[in-house]
UniProtKB/Swiss-Prot annotation:
Transmembrane annotation, as ranges: 227-251, 259-277, 293-314, 450-468
Mode of membrane association: Multi-pass membrane protein
Topological domain spans for side Extracellular: 19-226, 278-292
Role summary: Component of neuronal acetylcholine receptors (nAChRs) that function as pentameric, ligand-gated cation channels with high calcium permeability among other activities. nAChRs are excitatory neurotrasnmitter receptors formed by a collection of nAChR subunits known to mediate synaptic transmission in the nervous system and the neuromuscular junction. Each nAchR subunit confers differential attributes to channel properties, including activation, deactivation and desensitization kinetics, pH sensitivity, cation permeability, and binding to allosteric modulators.
Source organism (scientific name): Gallus gallus (Chicken)
Cytoplasmic topological intervals: 252-258, 315-449
Reaction(s) this enzyme catalyzes, per UniProt: Ca(2+)(in) = Ca(2+)(out); K(+)(in) = K(+)(out); Na(+)(in) = Na(+)(out)
SUPFAM superfamilies, per the entry: Neurotransmitter-gated ion-channel transmembrane pore (SSF90112), Nicotinic receptor ligand binding domain-like (SSF63712)
Keywords linked to the UniProt accession: Cell membrane, Disulfide bond, Glycoprotein, Ion channel, Ion transport, Ligand-gated ion channel, Membrane, Receptor, Signal, Synapse, Transmembrane, Transmembrane helix, Transport
GO-annotated cellular components: acetylcholine-gated channel complex; axon; cation channel complex; cytoplasm; dendrite; neuron projection; neurotransmitter receptor complex; perikaryon
Pfam families xrefs: Neur_chan_LBD, Neur_chan_memb
Protein name: Neuronal acetylcholine receptor subunit beta-2
Subunit structure: Neuronal AChR is a heteropentamer composed of two different types of subunits: alpha and beta. CHRNB2/Beta-2 subunit can be combined to CHRNA2/alpha-2, CHRNA3/alpha-3 or CHRNA4/alpha-4, CHRNA5/alpha-5, CHRNA6/alpha-6 and CHRNB3/beta-3 to give rise to functional receptors.
Amino acid sequence: MALLRVLCLLAALRRSLCTDTEERLVEYLLDPTRYNKLIRPATNGSQLVTVQLMVSLAQLISVHEREQIMTTNVWLTQEWEDYRLTWKPEDFDNMKKVRLPSKHIWLPDVVLYNNADGMYEVSFYSNAVISYDGSIFWLPPAIYKSACKIEVKHFPFDQQNCTMKFRSWTYDRTEIDLVLKSEVASLDDFTPSGEWDIVALPGRRNENPDDSTYVDITYDFIIRRKPLFYTINLIIPCILITSLAILVFYLPSDCGEKMTLCISVLLALTVFLLLISKIVPPTSLDVPLVGKYLMFTMVLVTFSIVTSVCVLNVHHRSPTTHTMPPWVRTLFLRKLPALLFMKQPQQNCARQRLRQRRQTQERAAAATLFLRAGARACACYANPGAAKAEGLNGYRERQGQGPDPPAPCGCGLEEAVEGVRFIADHMRSEDDDQSVSEDWKYVAMVIDRLFLWIFVFVCVFGTVGMFLQPLFQNYATNSLLQLGQGTPTSK
């Protein structure tokens, strides 16, 4: 028990000595008589202070397309040497490292030059790790809002290149030399984003040939958008609305809803166009891919409205207003239906058989009426005695007598025949007019089917052509980036 007390006492004494040692070391390093944090750590005015810089991306918070701002959470690693912050470890119980508040030592005041919100400094001034040889390691976290030029050409299958430029605010190259610690930014503690994929984070050191005092460190944040959200909520509804525009040509003209469907589709596309205008930045340099597709669809819908008006005009034509040209009959009634997989009604259909039967009945009724009228006329002028002896059919002309005088009631017979002929001609004319009207309706149906196939091919190839182009372009860009990362670069 006594031994345990002795060990505890020794441990407490050692901790006290260590605390006293660290306190003595801090007081020694920050002694105002030997250290001034406002003075650059150089022995003379021509000596350069080399600052090694590296960015570690912790989180890609957001990319605001309309304001063209990228918000990131980064850790800014900075390393340099200060000859004034050196000591001999043997004088301080072999203590080789100490942590000092960063605001109590000299800092290279590296800031984000392309800042977008006025917060150029880091978010938190963490402690700096000082080694006995004077090397300083400082890792402050920061949330930066940097300006980013958004390329909307392939939205939502776009890939952006947002840069972050770091430079000392007050020191130039004759006093501080910024050096890249690593060619790429670190992703060791990165939290994946739900909207963007990190393609590459290369860094480079920039110098100005015209200005020997200029130097900066620039990191390129090459990011690719995850298009699933916009595909589900924007592109697929647009494609479905386009399919409704195609179905306009499959809708029968007699239903009277062609124009209603066309206008409804056009209004729906206008609403989607307004949604896109609130997402993408108001730039006149490029039109987003979805905007191009919507404009393409709106042009098709507008054209479908024009063609629907023409189809309805053809559908409601009649022989009293229009005459069908021979080329229309040849093209739209004989040739195009076979090419468009339309089966034209045959001549022996039920309606044609009914029409022939009606014509046969009309001829039979006219013949019966004619025979009845002729029989009554002959019975009026026949001799009753002769009729009994010879009959009406045995009536013969007497020799020596002239021809019989004209029958007084022949005019009635002619009027009856003319009336029957007029009725037959009128019914035949109505039947012919109805046949021509049905031909016009069939021509309208052929035009509808023709534009249906045209719209199907245009929409399919237009959609595939528009949305495959950015995918191939992103693939080519990624291949070039991989080749560039595999090739060593010179600083």
